[in-house]
């Protein structure tokens, strides 16, 4: 968040948003966002184990009772044993305040945020249904605002796919270049390659890679050095 704040000060005309997963659900972070002049927006997925309450009611129960603002279809990419799928989710939102933890007497008593609750329709029919709670310092005034916050958070999946392409596809960790400058130069090339592959997942490989490159790629995947003929059948 502090690094994004530094960039935000360099481009005050642009709205930047720091996005965090459940490990970022920390009261002190929201307090910092409120107290930082010209701070970027903050969007964090809540950890359901946090015993946060609104008007003495568990916030997850409270948000589930709010009027549904609308529905949205999101794409859930493949991850491990989880298959890729599209899911329809219902969206609820409300302005609320995060109360400081009971064991924290040094922080301010509460921090205003907007909560966006996302729950999958017919979630009982899937093994891992979507149920998210997002807290954000960026105002949510209507369904379009809430939809945009959900899309911001869902964009993290694209970042994960990009990093996986860089790591597994480009094999950046296998580079043995001997110096930081060489690694940095190589990373600059591989990042562009990973970015182009990420944005062209449905294109036929011949539109991007030449026949020679495709042949070399197959040989490398098979563990044969360039120029090695394929094994002969007995």
Language-model segments: residues:
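Single, function-defining residue in the core of a domain
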Residues: 1-234
């Amino acid at each position: 968040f502090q690094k994004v704040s530094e960039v935000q000060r360099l481009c005050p005309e642009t709205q930047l948003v720091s996005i965090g997963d459940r490990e970022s659900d920390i009261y002190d972070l929201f307090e910092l966002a409120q107290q930082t002049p010209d701070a970027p927006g903050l969007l964090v997925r809540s950890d359901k184990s946090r015993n946060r309450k609104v008007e003495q009611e568990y916030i997850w129960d409270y948000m589930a009772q709010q009027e549904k603002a609308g529905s949205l279809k999101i794409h859930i990419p493949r991850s491990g044993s989880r298959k890729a799928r599209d899911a329809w989710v219902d969206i609820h939102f409300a302005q609320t305040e995060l109360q400081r933890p009971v064991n924290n007497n040094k922080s301010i008593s509460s921090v205003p945020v907007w909560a966006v609750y996302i729950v999958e329709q017919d979630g009982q029919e899937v093994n891992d249904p979507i149920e998210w709670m997002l807290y954000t310092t960026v105002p949510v005034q209507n369904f379009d605002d809430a939809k945009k916050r959900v899309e911001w958070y869902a964009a993290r999946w694209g970042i994960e796919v990009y990093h996986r392409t860089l790591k597994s596809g480009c094999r950046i960790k296998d580079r043995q270049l001997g110096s930081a400058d060489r690694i940095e130069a190589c990373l600059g090339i591989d990042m562009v390659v990973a970015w182009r592959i990420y944005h062209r997942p449905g294109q036929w490989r011949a539109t991007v890679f030449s026949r020679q490159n495709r042949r070399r790629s197959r040989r490398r995947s098979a563990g044969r050095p360039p120029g090695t003929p394929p094994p002969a059948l007995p």
